Structures are given as C-alpha cells and as structure tokens.
Amino acid sequence: MNENEKKLLSDIECLPNVDCKCDFGDIVRAFADYKINDELKFKVRQIALNLRPWRKGPFEILETFIDSEWQSFMKFNLLKPFMDLQGKKVADIGCNNGYYLFRMSNLGAKKLIGFDPGVRTFLQFRFLEHFLKSGVIYELLGVENLPDYGEKFDSIFCLGVLYHRSDPVRALKELKSSLNSGGEVFLDTMFIDGDDEICLFPRLSYAKISNIYFLPTIRTLQNWCERAKFKDFEILAVKATDENEQRKTDWIYGQSLGDFLDPFDKTRTIEGYPAPKRVYVRVKI
C-alpha cells in the first residue's frame, strides 16, 4: 500500500462500531433504526468519497448513497435464477469491492471468499464490511493464485475477468483446478458475433482499455472451455452492455461507456471494433 492507502485504511479502522441493520437487495444498505449523529455521517461520506472510483454497486451506508459506475444488480439478477448456493463454498474471482458476494450472503452459502489483487477495491470492501458484517472473506489474490490457495470450491464466479487474461485457457484451467468434484463455474466475458472459431485481438486497446486481449466467438469460448476439460457448456444469457448498466457518475473519475463508443455509431467502439456484448455461461466438471 502507498501512504494514501495506508491513511485510508487507518481512517476505516478508526470508525466506531455501529449497530446496523442490513439489506442485501439491489442497493446493498447498512442503516440504523436510531438517529446517527451528523459528525459520523459526515465522516462516512468523506471516507466513501476518498475511496473513489466506485466501479461496482450501488451501496447506501448510513445515508450516504454510493452511485457506482456499474448498476451491478442487473448482472446479479440475471444470474440469480441459476444460483443454488445452499451449503456451498463459493468464490468470486475478480470480486472488486465484494458487491456480488454481499448479494449472495443471504443465499445460504457455507463460505464466501472473494479474490482480487486491487488494493483500492480491498479498502472499499473493508469500509463496507465494517458496517455490513457479512462474514465475507477477501483475499488480495488473482486467478493465478487459485491452484495454490489450499481450498477448493463448489461454485466459482468469474465475471468480467477472462478478457483481461493474455492466456485465457490457462485461466480456465486454474479455475477448474480449484473446483470440488461436481463443481461449477459461472463465466461472463465479452464476445464477438459469428460461428467461426476465431477471436478479436485488439491492436492497442478495446473501448480505450489496453489490457483487453481476446474477445472470442461463443463457439471459440466453448472450445476454450473444452480444452480446459470442462463439460456441460450452458449459455445462460447474451446481453449488450449499454449506458443503463454502465455510466459516468460523481462516484468515479474520468470516463465511462459513453466515452468509449463511437459518438456517431454506438454499435462500434471508439477504435472501430464491435461494441461490447457479453455472454453468460455455466460450465461444470
């Protein structure tokens, strides 16, 4: 951690304990059924502002509404009908600040563990968990650390990660190695249309993001999963990303989806590639 991050962690750790009630709905909320003094409300808001950018959410903590860039409940609600987490050990790879894990915390899972190497998102999680007290565990680790983690899982969520990996088949193998017998992986990745066994590999960037590598056709994604020895490739949904789901707010810095697309043709990125579309799949071993 740098000095600013250490200061933020200290500020979070110095927050008083508050007897909160929680709501793990579309807006994940921590609130009190008694009057909270203005000094504490101000402190909570200032820490939340200092933790920007907030990519995933939304949250409301002691009357501070955190309007995140992504309306993450759209993705969660799309996947929820396919979730059966009762009594299971669950991992979320690339968990960001833990939004999806908080949403899962009332679905009966035995254990919920998030993996993400991002320090800023870890600090956001620590801030949220101070009030939510969900019991979710957060590890500052990535998908490459899974094989050596020492625990295996019944359900793994890997949402919006695969296109950031320069070796996606290896990442899939790392996910598979971390499953218990009969386990499942929920995947979400960007894709391109077509039936050919091909990928888009952006020259310099995709939607102004430099660490996006392979955008496969769905058939190619299935090939990757089969190469990693998964079976039962099940398409759950296909959805274009739009500005209802991802947009600029006061809780992020810089640009968002509207700035990443061609201003004259929203079906193309600023670089001229097809605009983002996502496929949601479940695979098993």
From Swiss-Prot:
It holds the Pfam family Methyltransf_9. It is an enzyme of class 2 (transferase). One of its GO terms (molecular function) is transferase activity, transferring alkyl or aryl (other than methyl) groups. Carboxy-S-adenosyl-L-methionine binds at residues 56, 70, 75, 94, 143-144, 163, 278. The keyword Transferase applies. Its EC number is 2.5.1.-. GO terms for biological process: tRNA wobble uridine modification. It catalyses: carboxy-S-adenosyl-L-methionine + 5-hydroxyuridine(34) in tRNA = 5-carboxymethoxyuridine(34) in tRNA + S-adenosyl-L-homocysteine + H(+). The keyword Zinc does not apply. Keywords: Transferase, tRNA processing. Belongs to the class I-like SAM-binding methyltransferase superfamily. CmoB family. Homotetramer. Catalyzes carboxymethyl transfer from carboxy-S-adenosyl-L-methionine (Cx-SAM) to 5-hydroxyuridine (ho5U) to form 5-carboxymethoxyuridine (cmo5U) at position 34 in tRNAs. This is tRNA U34 carboxymethyltransferase. It comes from Campylobacter hominis (strain ATCC BAA-381 / DSM 21671 / CCUG 45161 / LMG 19568 / NCTC 13146 / CH001A).
